[in-house]
Amino acid sequence: AHTPNGITRILETVRKQYVHRKGQLIHVFGSAGLRDHTKRFAMGKASATFADISYVTEEDYRTEDPQKIADEIGAGFGRKHYLVELNREKAIHTAIQSAKKDDVVIITGKGHEKSLCRGKIEYPWDEIQTVKNILKI
């Protein structure tokens, strides 16, 4: 999910179908740098609306300041608390480690993509393998 609508649809669906009354929906996401700035507020608002806990992190920030991107996303949260961890691997690790029985962790933005752009350099990235490593599977 790279758009406010995509985030809304996946989080709303997961909340309705999988999150039990005592479980929480944990969302890890970011927004790409040097792309549509106007969607960031709405992405934050979507996560604030449907997730219980949100981690805002990097997602191909390119040459844009990742903290600025996080701040623009954060504006969509209004008064609702959210967490910022600009290192994507650390954000995913923290979200997974904090999850309890019946919680669901949703990570949006990178999925099948095989690189993570930081500055002008494309670094190898495998989100699925990252999650498997954290879960030790």
Predicted regions and their residues:
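ATP-dependent carboxylate-amine ligase
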Residues: 1-137
